[in-house]
């Protein structure tokens, strides 16, 4: 029985050694292929420790095997041992050991000491962040590590996922990630509810309904409600009977007060509503109070914007008659600068506005004495389309007629070389440009050119 016991001790030692080697393997090399993102320093340290541990394990195993090889073989049916080695949740690995007798003693104590040493090394590595294999694919941050971007400070944002997976502890903790992963609150105000406007924007309203809309517009500060109310009033102002009703209800000051708002959409809708109201001559008497303010805002707002176009349309309507043109004479240089700088649509609308002034002979002296950019002459080039050419030719024709009718040709010394008078009358460049347009391919432009040339 003594030799059987010794053989059993040898078998137990080999089983324990094999199990320890398997544990070391699982702790060091048995990693998931999907989780190979490690820091370079940690990899170097782990490789050195794993190498030393594996060398030591091999030496111990050779010692045990050498000692067992000196004994006599026993009956296989008695000495054959089957052991399941592996993690508790992992798949079992069957080891079959054929122990042999040996003459030495104390193998059981040596096996226990070896197992204890390997176990301590495994615990030490686990404490430094070595991971045990997990069946679950879910990874959570350990409580000892700061969450990326959280209060504990900071992992690099580009490596958040890899650092979080590599820094998990041996036990899988079923906890949520830090609060920093939650979506941050938006800095922009969110509209809590929609205002139910009592009418549709294209409804034709009666006087009581218009009064309700004006009351809403006067009391609200909500941009959405203001926009809907202004569009509703602007659409109704397209009808002559409602133009009078809005004026009689005191709607012009209520609408015009929104000219001062900073919201460009609200200003655009305000100008559109006033533009429709300005078709009525009595309404123009109410709107003239705000015409200078509209002109200033139109000149300083963003070039070619919708607000600028709406302002130019309102100014054009307000200058169709001669009653309020003198209120805008101080802005003549700005109009010509806008005529040169603006895009196609801004140019056309500005020309229509200036043509209104040229049709009033009383405004001729102020108009031709203002300073204009010399590049304005480029508007007479053939490259422009029919509408721009017809408008610039009309502008030149009206100014030339007014200079003759007002007798300003004899007082040419009053005007500077940078004035519109010098550009159109004295330089002779305009006349050359107009003569060059006589060969234009557009028949309408040709007819207009011939008409202008006959008046020179």
From Swiss-Prot:
Recorded topology in the membrane: Single-pass membrane protein
Tissue expr: Widely expressed in the adult nervous tissue, especially in the forebrain, including the cerebral cortex, hippocampus and thalamus.
Biased composition (Basic and acidic residues): 51-62, 72-81
Stretches the record annotates as Mitochondrion outer membrane (MOM)-targeting sequence: 1-6, 26-36
ARM repeats: 198-238, 240-279, 361-401, 418-456
Keyword Membrane assigned: yes
GO terms for biological process, alphabetical: hematopoietic stem cell homeostasis
UniProt feature, compositional bias: Basic residues: 162-180
Family: Belongs to the eutherian X-chromosome-specific Armcx family.
Protein name in the entry: Armadillo repeat-containing X-linked protein 1
Species assigned in the record: Mus musculus
């Amino acid at each position: 029985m003594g030799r059987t016991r010794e053989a059993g001790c040898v078998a137990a030692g080999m089983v324990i050694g094999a199990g320890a080697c398997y544990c070391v393997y699982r702790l060091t090399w048995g990693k998931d292929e999907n989780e190979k993102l490690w820091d370079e320093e940690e990899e170097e340290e782990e490789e050195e420790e794993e190498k030393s541990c594996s060398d030591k394990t091999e030496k111990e195993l050779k010692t045990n095997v050498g000692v067992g090889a000196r004994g006599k073989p026993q009956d296989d049916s008695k000495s054959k041992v089957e052991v399941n080695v592996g993690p508790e949740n992992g798949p079992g690995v069957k080891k079959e050991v054929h122990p042999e007798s040996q003459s030495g003693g104390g193998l059981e104590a040596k096996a226990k000491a070896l197992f204890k040493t390997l176990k301590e090394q495994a615990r030490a590595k686990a404490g430094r962040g070595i991971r045990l294999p997990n069946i679950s694919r879910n990874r959570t941050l350990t409580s000892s590590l700061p969450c990326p971007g959280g209060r504990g400070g900071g992992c690099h944002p580009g490596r958040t996922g890899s650092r979080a997976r590599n820094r998990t502890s041996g036990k899988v903790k079923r906890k949520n990630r830090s609060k920093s992963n939650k979506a941050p609150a938006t800095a922009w105000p969110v509209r809590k509810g929609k205002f139910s406007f009592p009418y549709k924007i294209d409804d034709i309203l009666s006087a009581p309904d218009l009064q309700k809309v004006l009351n809403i517009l006067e009391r609200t500060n909500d941009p959405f409600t203001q926009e809907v109310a202004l569009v509703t009033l602007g659409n109704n102002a397209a009808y002559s009977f409602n133009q009078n009703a809005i004026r009689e209800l005191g709607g012009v000051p209520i609408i015009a007060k929104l000219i001062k708002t900073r919201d460009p959409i609200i200003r655009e809708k305000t100008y559109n509503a006033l533009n429709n109201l300005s078709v009525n001559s009595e309404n123009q008497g109410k709107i003239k109070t705000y015409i200078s303010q509209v002109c200033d805002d139109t000149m300083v707002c963003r070039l070619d914007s919708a607000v600028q176009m709406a302002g130019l349309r309102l100014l054009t309507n307000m200058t169709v008659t001669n009653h309020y043109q003198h209120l805008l004479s101080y802005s003549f240089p700005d109009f010509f600068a806008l005529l040169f700088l603006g895009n196609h649509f801004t140019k056309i609308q500005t020309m229509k506005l200036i043509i209104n002034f040229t049709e009033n002979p009383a405004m001729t002296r102020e108009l031709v004495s203002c300073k204009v950019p010399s590049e304005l002459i480029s508007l007479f080039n053939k490259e422009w389309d029919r509408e721009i050419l017809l408008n610039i030719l009309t502008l030149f024709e009206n100014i030339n007629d007014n200079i003759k009718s007002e007798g300003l040709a004899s007082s040419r010394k009053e005007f500077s070389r940078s004035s519109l008078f010098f550009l159109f009358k004295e330089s002779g460049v305009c006349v050359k440009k107009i003569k060059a347009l006589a060969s234009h391919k557009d028949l309408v432009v040709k007819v207009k050119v011939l008409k202008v040339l006959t008046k020179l």
